Amino acid sequence: MRCTVFGTGYLGATHAAGMAELGHEVLGVDIDAGKVAKLASGEIPFYEPGLRKLLNDNIAAGRLAFTTDYDAGAEFADLHFLAVGTPQKKGEYAADLRHVHAVVDRLVPRLNRPAVIVGKSTVPVGTAAELRGRVRGLAPGVNVEIAWNPEFLREGFAVQDTLHPDRIVLGVQRDSSAAEASIRELYAPLLARQVPLLVTDLQTAELVKVSANAFLATKISFINAISEVCEAVDADVTLLADALGHDPRIGRRFLNAGLGFGGGCLPKDIRAFMARAGELGANHALTFLSEVDAINMRRRSRMVELATVACGGSLLGANIAVLGAAFKPESDDVRDSPALNVAGMLQLNGATVNVYDPKAMENSRRQFPTLNYSTSVSEACERADAVLVLTEWREFVELDPAGLAGSVRAKVVVDGRNCLDADRWMRAGWRFHCLGRGAAAHSR
């Protein structure tokens, strides 16, 4: 089977390579000639474990190619995926759909035979219905169906999530005649492994993704709110989360108290969800998401407060090592990164900040050029008054506190992700600070 993928960023490149791995012929289309040239040569412009090999294997097999030519994309296949970004509008909560509209406006007039356009991008509910009207005006007389197949990729696990998904959701038009059959053929290898396929209307499929992200964000902010109470009474939020997680109705995943969530999805998606609910007159239904967002942002301020305490009450003149810049481990994504945000606030409060991340240094320099960047943990920690672990890379979790002691000026560590073994660090003579554990971390 043949398909095209319009947009070759994180989502598009992963989907294109994944569909080629399933045995299909795939053409990735993007207006960015530099990005297309990199991908065509087997390079990916971001870090994602396993994706480069997947890309190169399928280019070599002749199943995957990339182009800037929309005419070639329109001619290549009758199944077209939209995988462009939907960022937050500047100064607003709403999603910016200009990239989605641009692809549709360029592609559809070039279609001269029946086709199915399938959205992968995260969009406000009602977008697919709006695109249906747009398509009818752009290609009168040509049967072009709109469908929605939301992605559920986790950065750092995108290849796994593409080739071994938990479920496949497909939203189709009520009068659809081709979309479901096309998707069943495309995903046949996955369906043969009993991956569930849920076929819905368009608006339900659009809501599935944003609802999933809203729920995950709520779960993270819930445990972070509880961690504030734990700090007030010297309880241990990690033990509390373990106890909650044994309840099968709750589960342990996403109950990791710490610095909170960031990245290019959860923050902007819950804000866009709130904005869309307001447009639909259902704003009261999602007011709780405002508090979810507020709790999440408050964690960053709380980390600065904790660092200030760790440095004796003032950051002025303090030398602080920040370990972690990506918003999560196994990624180089620094969009709305809590770690970088905290590093910037520390600098604004008078500290000299030295940042190290195994994969996100280049992106970090572009976003925060005024910070100091180091090439290793030991360099970042040289003569540090405090070491802050803000992204839970394995390299940081497995640090040897005794070995690191020779680099720092003061043996003070602040665990922003509750990922370190507190007892191990304290036995090595370090003062240990963390979020949500109060004195409990010092008493075991």
Please state what every model-predicted region is.
Residues 1-444:
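Structural/interface elements that position substrates and couple domains in central-metabolism enzymes
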